[in-house]
Amino acid sequence: KAYDDYFCNQLTELCTEYGELFSVWFDGACGEGPNGKKQVYDWDRYYALIRKLQPNAAIAISGPDIRWCGNEAGDTRESEWSVLPTGFDDPDAVAAKSQQADDGKFREKKISETERDLGSRFFLENAAGYAWRPAETDTSIRPGWFYHASEDDRVRSTETLLDIWYRTVGGNSTLLLNIPPDKRGLFHETDVQRLREMGETLRKTFAVNFAETAAITADRDDGYHPAENVRENNYQAYYKPFDGENAVTLTFKLEKPQEVTHVVLKEHIPMSQRIEKYAVEAKLPDGAWREIARGTTVGYQKIERFEAVRTDALRIRILDSRVCPVLSFVGIY
């Protein structure tokens, strides 16, 4: 009780003196005191205080809103679902799977095979209830979470960081990338250079969206939410077919032939996550269509990367969906 009182006083300060917070992050690790005692936390009290003082803040990891992806290596699932069975917000379960000591081998561990599937129909069929629990992938730009001069030559490469970004931010997960300050209280020059290279690459890649000027059609819609709506990168407008139409095709006729390397898909997640399988096709000069990418889940964002293809038209084929698919955005780059 004394610890919880002290903690809530500090939490009150943090939630009232620093403006609006987008997240309150509780680590899964629970360290022992010098006497071997592990603190027992009054989680419900903490959550209630945050909801009162910062109602828009997402409570992450050991909390009810944002789920830890299950590793610190930057590994991700091929099919990342945000709709899960209830029970994944148990802080004790999160703590049991978290790092128990400063362990380099733990930070290299990938998602276990038994936790690759958390949200498929098979996994959900006997669930007592369901919850919206999007994933956060947390990893470090260096081998560990803190700065060590001896690791200045072990900063992750730009290529590795971009791969992690595409698999997380482009794979229906969020990304927490740890950048530890050095003994000067600054980010080390090598780390900064990697981040600049990463940012420059992403800005260049996504500078021009060919879908903005494309003619967009769908083989069906519900009469109220046309395919044209996927130009807008927001949740105010979206494309939707009639209920029960779980397989649809959207066609994008570009203004002129372009070299295309990326396609971005976003579901209208205010109406949940629905898509289970999709394919991206490019039109060849002879008029035939060739599949250039195929995937499973989409969620808030899925980014497909592929070898450059020159084309003047692309098709997004939703092959299967739990209920009729609802897309808020499609980008072609």
Regions found by a protein language model. Give the residues of each.
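Mature catalytic domains of secreted/periplasmic carbohydrate-active enzymes
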Residues: 1-246, 251-252, 259, 264-267, ...
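Edge beta-strands of jelly-roll/beta-sandwich modules across compartments, strongly enriched
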Residues: 322-333
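Exposed beta-strand face motif in extracellular beta-rich ectodomains
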Residues: 312-314
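A generic beta-sheet turn/junction motif
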Residues: 256-258, 284, 309, 320
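Beta-strand signatures of extracellular beta-sandwich domains
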Residues: 279-281, 331
